UniProtKB/Swiss-Prot annotation:
Residues 1-16 form the signal peptide. Belongs to the glycosyl hydrolase 22 family. It comes from Bufo gargarizans andrewsi. CDD domains: LYZ_C. Its EC number is 3.2.1.17. This is Lysozyme C. Transmembrane segments: none annotated. Lysozymes have primarily a bacteriolytic function; those in tissues and body fluids are associated with the monocyte-macrophage system and enhance the activity of immunoagents. Has antibacterial activity against the Gram-positive bacterium S.aureus and against the Gram-negative bacterium E.coli with a MIC of 1 uM and 8 uM respectively. No antifungal activity against C.albicans. Disulfide bonds join 22-144, 46-132, 81-97, 93-111.
Length: 146
């Protein structure tokens, strides 16, 4: 007789790739991003939404410098991670870009902390400057039990 795989077993093979807003807020708070370098949790949720739609598997190629943005925060391979194909990659976070695409977002949080520690702060993210900076961001954590 054949072996049946239960629903629970089959789910363990699936990688969680797209977060819900409040679920992400909890994960980022747990990872220590709330008020890190003076940026509220709402800033991070807003940025993640506009960069990746809360999708950890998101990638975007940038033809001008042949770099790629990876993961929930769209961390760039020219400066922050190594994808082994971007010319003159600095790999400042000392991380393989592929790690930023997994369901464990702690490497992305760790690298985001490194990014925001630079003088540019969250200004490193175009989406933050365009959609989040100086805005009322209270709706990004509204209704979340944090």
């Amino acid at each position: 007789s054949g072996k049946y795989i239960s629903w629970e077993d089959s789910c363990s093979y699936l990688q969680l790739q797209k977060y819900e807003r409040c679920e992400l807020a909890k994960a980022l708070k747990k990872g220590g991003l709330a008020d890190f370098k003076g940026y509220s949790l709402e800033n991070w949720i807003c940025t993640a939404f506009h960069e990746s739609g809360y999708n950890t598997a998101s990638t975007n190629y940038n033809p001008p410098d042949k770099s790629t943005d990876y993961g929930i925060f769209q961390i760039n391979s020219r400066w922050w991670c190594n994808d082994y194909k971007t010319p003159r990659s600095k790999n400042t976070c000392n991380i393989d870009c592929k790690v930023l695409l997994g369901d464990d977002i702690s490497p992305a949080i760790k690298c985001a902390k490194r990014v925001v520690s630079d003088p540019n702060g969250m200004g490193a993210w175009v989406a933050w400057k365009k959609y989040c900076k100086g805005k009322n961001l209270s709706q990004w954590t509204q209704g979340c039990k944090l």
